[in-house]
């Protein structure tokens, strides 16, 4: 009888511990990259996930868009996104979801051509939408969710 009670108590304790582990809130960690802007965080880590803020194609050194139109902005967006993900302990190849915001859906095919070159394997899940306007009149903005390395 003692053995049965001990087994029951042990199983109950394990069950309570497991439920606590799955329902306990994860700690949130803010990732700091570049000069602070005070308006939003470049990325937030919760558990094993990294959530980035949207990245536009501003060169962080000059504060300007690179010359060269849509392709140049796209390439700078991915440089910025890569920098934020790497500062978070992740990387582009660990992205699981991306949301692409385009100022003009006529850039969709060009974006797809450039986008597929960014990944070694299967690309992450993705949503692409056209928006009325982006900050600083950017042509593209990308936000991502990634897992830690």
Language-model features, listed with the residues they occupy:
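Surface-exposed aromatic
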Residues: 96-98
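N-terminal presequence-like segments and the immediate start of the first folded domain
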Residues: 4-8, 16-79, 83-93, 102-149
């Amino acid at each position: 009888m003692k053995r049965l009670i001990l087994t029951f108590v042990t199983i109950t304790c394990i069950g309570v511990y497991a439920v606590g582990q799955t329902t306990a809130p994860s700690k949130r960690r803010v990732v700091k990259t570049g000069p602070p802007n005070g308006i939003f965080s470049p990325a937030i880590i919760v558990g094993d996930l990294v959530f980035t803020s949207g990245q536009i194609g501003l060169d962080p050194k000059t504060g300007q868009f690179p010359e060269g139109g849509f392709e140049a902005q796209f390439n700078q967006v991915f440089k910025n996104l890569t920098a934020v993900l790497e500062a978070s302990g992740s990387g582009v190849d660990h992205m699981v979801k991306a949301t692409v915001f385009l100022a003009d859906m006529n850039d969709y095919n060009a974006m797809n051509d450039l986008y597929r070159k960014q990944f070694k394997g299967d690309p992450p899940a993705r949503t692409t939408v056209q928006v009325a306007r982006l900050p600083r009149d950017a042509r593209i903005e990308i936000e991502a969710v990634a897992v830690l390395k």
